[in-house]
Amino acid sequence: MFVKKGLLLVVSGPSGAGKGTICKELLKENDTIKLSVSATTRKPRTGEVDGVNYFFISKEKFEEMIEKGEFLEYAQIYDNFYGTPKAAIMECLEKGQDVLLEIEMQGAKQIKEVCPEGVFIFVLPPSLEELKNRIVGRGTETEAEIEKRFSCAYEEIKMIKDYDYFIFNEDVKTSAKEIEGIISSEKNKVSRYKNIIIEKFKEEL
């Protein structure tokens, strides 16, 4: 057998769609998938741990990392910056380990330009009404922030055209299983591994 390069799994969706909860469930059931920890300038939410959920850094530190070219992608979302550190991800993929990125649409677009072979998955809410209920239910945003996120949701959903797959998140466990199915399918995709397969059997002649 040959060692398959790891899959870069990029999961996005509008705020409140539940992408973070789905990713937690996916990681809980699949210890072979490594979560890429993003850096952000926003303040931690209740229960979030530095270095686990995000690297919470200052705006000055973030700008320094941009200057050094240490991000695979970065973007400004609302009033904060988010970025994906590059080195650790590339190392994991070369070793054959799958890496999961939960990022916003701006960041995903940059990732696709650099890593077009990635697997891009868009998480949709069952409805816009349910989306708003989820954002309100988090209790982490002010009323103005809630309205800002909700008003952006439709524009964000229109960006689905840049993705490979979509899932409607009505149930977290079901959604995680759907992503597992996508991973299985991608790992046996001829277009992804055809050259390696042909080379393997050529060497055996």
Curated annotation (Swiss-Prot):
<keyword id="KW-0547">Nucleotide-binding</keyword>
<dbReference type="InterPro" id="IPR008144">
    <property type="entry name" value="Guanylate_kin-like_dom"/>
</dbReference>
<keyword id="KW-0418">Kinase</keyword>
<dbReference type="GO" id="GO:0005829">
    <property type="term" value="C:cytosol"/>
</dbReference>
<feature type="binding site">
    <location>
        <begin position="13"/>
        <end position="20"/>
    </location>
    <ligand>
        <name>ATP</name>
    </ligand>
</feature>
<keyword id="KW-0067">ATP-binding</keyword>
<dbReference type="InterPro" id="IPR020590">
    <property type="entry name" value="Guanylate_kinase_CS"/>
</dbReference>
<comment type="function">
    <text>Essential for recycling GMP and indirectly, cGMP.</text>
</comment>
<dbReference type="GO" id="GO:0004385">
    <property type="term" value="F:guanylate kinase activity"/>
</dbReference>
<comment type="similarity">
    <text>Belongs to the guanylate kinase family.</text>
</comment>
<dbReference type="InterPro" id="IPR017665">
    <property type="entry name" value="Guanylate_kinase"/>
</dbReference>
<dbReference type="InterPro" id="IPR027417">
    <property type="entry name" value="P-loop_NTPase"/>
</dbReference>
<keyword id="KW-0808">Transferase</keyword>
<feature type="domain" description="Guanylate kinase-like">
    <location>
        <begin position="6"/>
        <end position="184"/>
    </location>
</feature>
<dbReference type="Pfam" id="PF00625">
    <property type="entry name" value="Guanylate_kin"/>
</dbReference>
<dbReference type="InterPro" id="IPR008145">
    <property type="entry name" value="GK/Ca_channel_bsu"/>
</dbReference>
<dbReference type="GO" id="GO:0005524">
    <property type="term" value="F:ATP binding"/>
</dbReference>
<protein>
    <recommendedName>
        <fullName>Guanylate kinase</fullName>
        <ecNumber>2.7.4.8</ecNumber>
    </recommendedName>
</protein>
<keyword id="KW-0963">Cytoplasm</keyword>
